[in-house]
């Protein structure tokens, strides 16, 4: 590369545009995906939302499109992308494979970005944790992360395409949030973080990047309901965060766009990006 090309604007300044790319988001009707899907649409992507409840996911898709039509009118050179809704249990490997294949066929292209926000937490003292519950949370949070990554990567490898996988971990994957009794959730998220590292090493030769985004406390609608009327709980949680507040969902958008962009994060793989307001620094 000659000197003039190396120092050109397009070569030095990363682009966060996702024009024409198909992005699959699991947990598609959740609070985090609501803001992320809007940001991705604004960057030119087509989006496929996946969740267990098809009706809620379809409504989420309609909401994203309506937002795009209202907020992006006259601000976007390209037409607004497509947004589709799908129902799938990510803990079911066969269902995941069929759904991802149907998504690619529906949109007429192979998805090149996967954001796995699906998963859940629950509280049980370790000595009382029901075996059935323990198995299910590992199936959804752990195996589900693998199943969606596998189904996403296969057509990319077959078509010699690059891609980016973003698995949502948690600060609970590296620390224990006292006093919450969530041993199986913690175990599942620790597994997600190491799964991303393992897949990053295996799929680097295919130019498929795999990273984890690990949030701290997020003020999703679910979290707001949990702390509503429990001022002492909110105060206790925030007292353990150096920034002394919980995160708004929009504060994760920049990290998602960075990891999704082939230009911005082309040499970033196997990384666990922690966005927790400094919680883990104590």
From Swiss-Prot:
Keyword Cell membrane: no
Disulphide bond pairs: none
Active site (record annotation): 170, 185, 189
UniProt protein name: D-arabinitol 2-dehydrogenase [ribulose-forming]
Function: Catalyzes the NAD(+)-dependent oxidation of D-arabinitol at carbon 4 to produce D-ribulose.
Family named by the database record: Belongs to the short-chain dehydrogenases/reductases (SDR) family.
Species annotation: Candida tropicalis
PROSITE patterns the record matches: ADH_SHORT
Entry's transmembrane regions: none
GO BP field: arabitol metabolic process; carbohydrate metabolic process
InterPro entries in the record: NAD(P)-bd_dom_sf, Sc_DH/Rdtase_CS, SDR_fam
Span of the signal peptide: none
GO molecular function (one): D-arabinitol 2-dehydrogenase activity
Gene: ARD
Keyword NADP among UniProt keywords: yes
Catalytic activity, EC: 1.1.1.250
Lineage: Eukaryota, Fungi, Dikarya, Ascomycota, Saccharomycotina
Pathway: Carbohydrate metabolism; D-arabinitol metabolism
Catalytic activity: D-arabinitol + NAD(+) = D-ribulose + NADH + H(+)
Keywords, sorted A to Z: NADP, Oxidoreductase
A Pfam family recorded for this sequence: adh_short_C2
Root EC class: oxidoreductase
Domain of life the protein comes from: Eukaryota
Binding site for NADP(+): 32, 53, 185, 189, 218, 220
């Amino acid at each position: 590369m000659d000197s003039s090309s190396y120092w050109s604007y397009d070569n030095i300044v990363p682009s966060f545009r996702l024009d024409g790319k198909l992005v699959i988001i699991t947990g598609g009707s959740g609070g985090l995906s609501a803001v992320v899907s809007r940001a991705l649409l604004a960057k030119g992507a087509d989006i496929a939302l996946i969740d267990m409840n098809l009706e809620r996911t379809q409504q989420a898709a309609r909401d994203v499109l309506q937002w795009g039509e209202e907020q992006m009118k006259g601000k976007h050179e390209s037409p607004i992308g497509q947004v589709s809704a799908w129902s799938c249990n990510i803990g079911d490997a066969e269902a995941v494979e069929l759904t991802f294949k149907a998504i690619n066929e529906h949109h007429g292209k192979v998805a090149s970005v996967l954001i796995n926000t699906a998963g859940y937490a629950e509280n049980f003292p370790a000595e009382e944790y029901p075996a059935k519950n323990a198995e299910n949370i590992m199936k959804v949070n752990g195996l589900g992360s693998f199943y969606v990554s596998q189904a996403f990567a296969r057509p990319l490898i077959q078509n010699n395409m690059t891609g980016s996988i973003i698995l949502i971990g948690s600060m609970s994957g590296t620390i224990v949030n006292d006093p919450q009794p969530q041993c199986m959730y913690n175990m599942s998220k620790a597994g997600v973080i190491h799964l991303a590292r393992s897949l990053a090493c295996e799929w680097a030769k295919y130019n498929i990047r795999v990273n984890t985004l690990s949030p701290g406390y997020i003020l999703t609608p679910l979290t707001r309901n949990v702390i509503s009327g429990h001022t002492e709980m909110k105060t206790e949680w925030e007292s353990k965060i150096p920034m002394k507040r919980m995160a708004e969902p929009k504060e994760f958008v920049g990290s998602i766009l960075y990891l999704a962009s082939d230009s911005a994060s082309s040499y970033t793989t196997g990384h666990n990006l922690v966005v927790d307001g400094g919680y883990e620094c104590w």
